[in-house]
A protein has these predicted regions:
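Extended amphipathic alpha-helical segments with heptad-repeat/coiled-coil character used for oligomerization
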Residues: 93-134
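Flexible loop/turn segments at secondary-structure boundaries
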Residues: 58, 66-68, 108-113
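Short secondary-structure subsegments characteristic of cysteine-rich extracellular domains
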Residues: 70-89
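Eukaryote-specific, cytoplasm-facing alpha-helical/coiled-coil scaffolding segments in long proteins
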Residues: 25-32, 82-88, 108-115
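Short, glycine/acidic-rich hinge or "gate" loops at secondary-structure transitions
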Residues: 12-26, 72-75, 94-106
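Short, charged/polar micro-motifs that form catalytic or ligand-binding hotspots
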Residues: 43, 47, 68-75
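A structural motif corresponding to the C-terminal end of an alpha-helix
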Residues: 8, 84-99
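Structured mid-domain segments that build the active-site/substrate or prosthetic-cofactor binding neighborhood
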Residues: 1-63
């Protein structure tokens, strides 16, 4: 699913012309293309990066192992998950020749929303507190 979503994003940029963002594509922020030139050559051969991001490492570890990711057991589990994601990115890069990157991101703007959705789906996870103000 992640691969399909990332490739959908990548493929949606194919055929886009530099006019879509002159600052980026014509005036040098990314490239100096002619007006109306397609950006495709900057989507291939490692010039661009397709980013897979993850958030909620603590919450995932707490839900799956009932320990923090800072404990030896939790750290081992969290590292296995991250290595799995990294291996997937490496596999996709090898298969496509495109640059894939893995990012762990603090996502404060999503925390409340995702925590609410997780609580609705999985119930209360011990040691993870969510105060809903509705």
């Amino acid at each position: 699913l992640c691969y399909e979503a990332l490739m959908c994003r990548h493929n949606s940029l194919k055929g886009i012309r530099s006019d879509v963002s002159p600052v980026h594509w014509q005036y040098g922020a990314i490239a100096r293309l002619e007006k109306g030139e397609v950006i495709d050559k900057y989507l291939e051969k490692g010039y661009s990066t397709i980013s897979l991001g993850y958030i909620g490492l603590y919450e995932m570890t707490k839900l799956m192992k009932d320990v923090s990711h800072t404990t030896p057991e939790g750290e081992e589990f969290a590292l296995r998950v991250m290595k799995y994601l990294r291996a997937a990115c490496d596999k996709w890069k090898k298969e496509t020749g495109l640059g894939f990157a893995l990012y762990g991101t603090p996502a404060e703007s999503l925390c409340y929303r995702f925590a609410r959705i997780d609580k609705e789906r999985f119930g209360t996870i011990k040691a993870i507190i969510l105060i809903l103000t509705t």
